[in-house]
């Protein structure tokens, strides 16, 4: 890990891969919360001191030396992650290269369990015959609440029923505020944003970014374009950001995962759809490219796993120009 202060957390793409495998094997997804997680992490590899809390009634002039991480300490989450990783590896799990917070357990060539880590929350599923593995993990890390089949996880509602597994992102959308701008100010579209408006604009772009990553790939271009105005946005840009927040509330973003026909992951394929010029940036200083990664079986059933849009420096005016430039770059 390049940054020794940060802790890997499972990505949204890895969660979709997890759900694709789980529903195809007819497993039940579960979550387990760990009690006092940071106190169960590895010992700190440096000296860290804190001022004792008032409730401890420690004599004045004394400080405490921390042996383990605490909530709020920038090293705390990483130390807990390292402890979890080492324990899983000792139990025979493999850490996946595609996501360092995702682990698999294989016995006699067959996948029997998957665990995804997000700070102190484990998302997991597997063959119930090997539930003893989870018992060993809970002995090492005492667990609190354990839920299965219907629960919330990092902003998603995950629900399993006879149709499959639903990944519902509407809980996040419902919590978003939909701000309004006074009509007089809204009419001054070309005016630069003041400090307060700039703060609001950054907040809205951040909310849109989280929504796009989670479910709303249809607004990826809007996100990239609005992100280019973070340092010099206008009232028109703010109004556009507000409009896009409104769009987030218009649709309930639910992705349904159903079983792929081939049970073995060896029979699945990954393919990528990409568009080198999804749209030109409004400032005329670039365009936007996008790619979407899918998993499919040999019958053609497929699920989008992850997507990303990004700014490209070149600007094109037609499809022919785009294809010609792409050919030249190859």
Could you describe each region identified by the protein language model?
Residues 80-136, 140-145, 211-222, 299-304:
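Active-site palm subdomain of RNA-directed nucleic acid polymerases
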Residues 2, 293-325:
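A short, polar/acidic, helix/strand-boundary loop motif
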Residues 31-37, 63-73, 97-126, 149-159, ...:
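Catalytic palm active-site di-aspartate
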Residues 209, 273-306:
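Acidic, metal-ligating active-site segments
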Residues 38-52, 69-76, 105-142, 159-166, ...:
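Catalytic palm subdomain of template-directed nucleic-acid polymerases
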Residues 31-34, 258, 266-283, 327:
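Two-metal-ion RNase H-like nuclease active-site motif
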Residues 1-86, 126-127, 137-143, 174:
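Catalytic-core region of right-hand nucleic acid polymerases
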Residues 16-19, 148-256:
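C-terminal reverse transcriptase regions that engage the nucleic-acid substrate
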């Amino acid at each position: 890990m390049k940054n020794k202060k940060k802790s890997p957390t499972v990505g949204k793409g890895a969660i979709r891969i997890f759900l694709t495998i789980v529903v195809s094997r007819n497993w039940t997804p579960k979550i387990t919360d760990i009690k006092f997680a940071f106190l169960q992490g590895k010992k700190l590899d440096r000296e860290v001191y804190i001022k004792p809390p008032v409730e401890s009634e420690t004599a004045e002039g004394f400080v405490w030396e921390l042996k383990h991480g605490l909530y709020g300490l920038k090293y705390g989450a990483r130390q807990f992650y390292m402890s979890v990783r080492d324990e899983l590896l000792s139990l025979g799990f493999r850490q996946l290269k595609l996501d360092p917070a995702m682990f698999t357990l294989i016995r006699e060539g067959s996948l029997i369990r998957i665990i995804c880590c997000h700070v102190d929350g484990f998302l997991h599923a597997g063959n119930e015959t090997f539930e003893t593995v989870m018992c060993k993990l809970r002995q090492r890390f005492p667990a609190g609440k354990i839920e299965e089949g219907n629960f919330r996880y990092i902003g998603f509602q995950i629900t399993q029923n006879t149709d499959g597994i639903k990944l519902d992102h509407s809980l996040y959308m419902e919590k978003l505020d939909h701000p309004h701008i006074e009509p007089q100010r809204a009419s001054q579209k070309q005016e630069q944003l003041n400090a307060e408006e700039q703060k609001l604009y950054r907040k809205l772009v951040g909310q849109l970014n989280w929504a796009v990553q989670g479910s709303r790939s249809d607004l990826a271009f809007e996100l990239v374009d609005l992100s280019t105005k973070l340092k010099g946005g206008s009232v028109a840009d703010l109004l556009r950001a507000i409009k896009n927040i409104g769009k987030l509330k218009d649709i309930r973003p639910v992705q349904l995962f159903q079983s792929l026909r081939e049970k073995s992951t060896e029979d699945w394929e990954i393919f990528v759809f990409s568009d080198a010029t999804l749209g030109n940036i409004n400032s005329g200083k670039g365009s936007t490219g996008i790619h979407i990664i899918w998993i499919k079986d040999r019958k053609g059933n497929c699920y989008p796993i992850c997507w990303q849009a990004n700014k490209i420096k070149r600007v094109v005016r037609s499809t022919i120009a785009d294809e010609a430039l792409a050919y030249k770059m190859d």
